[in-house]
Amino acid sequence: MQKIRKGDKVVVLAGKDKGRTGEVIQVMPKEDRAVVRGVNVIKRHQRQTQTQEAGIISKEASLHLSNLAIVDKDGKPTRVGFKVVEGKKVRVAKTSGEVIDG
């Protein structure tokens, strides 16, 4: 089970976008990376093809999972733990102890 999943609201802990928050669009568990909406935006030069025009495209690049933390109910970054509730393994916020709904 992953600590950060698609749809989670996260805050960036390190790097050029430190302190910014966003929603996780994609998680790549094999690379330990995630793509966050509106964070770590890069510009790529697109060559013209038969279907696409040439130009500069902005898109989100991936961030390492160690640089992300889930945002708790009160808006502060929290670490994630696991607990078994009613026979199911669930994610729990370390700061408040609340179950993180997935």
Curated annotation (Swiss-Prot):
PROSITE patterns the record matches: RIBOSOMAL_L24
Keyword Oxidoreductase: no
CDD domains membership: KOW_RPL26
Keywords: Ribonucleoprotein, Ribosomal protein, RNA-binding, rRNA-binding
UniProt entry tagged with the keyword Ribosomal protein: yes
Pfam families, per the entry: KOW (PF00467), ribosomal_L24 (PF17136)
InterPro entries with a match to the protein in the record: KOW (IPR005824), Rib_uL2_dom2 (IPR014722), Ribosomal_uL24 (IPR003256), Ribosomal_uL24_CS (IPR005825), Ribosomal_uL24_KOW (IPR041988), Translation_prot_SH3-like_sf (IPR008991)
Subunit structure and binding partners: Part of the 50S ribosomal subunit.
Protein name in UniProt: Large ribosomal subunit protein uL24
Gene source species: Rhizobium rhizogenes (strain K84 / ATCC BAA-868) (Agrobacterium radiobacter)
Upper taxonomic lineage: Bacteria, Pseudomonadati, Pseudomonadota, Alphaproteobacteria, Hyphomicrobiales
GN (gene name): rplX
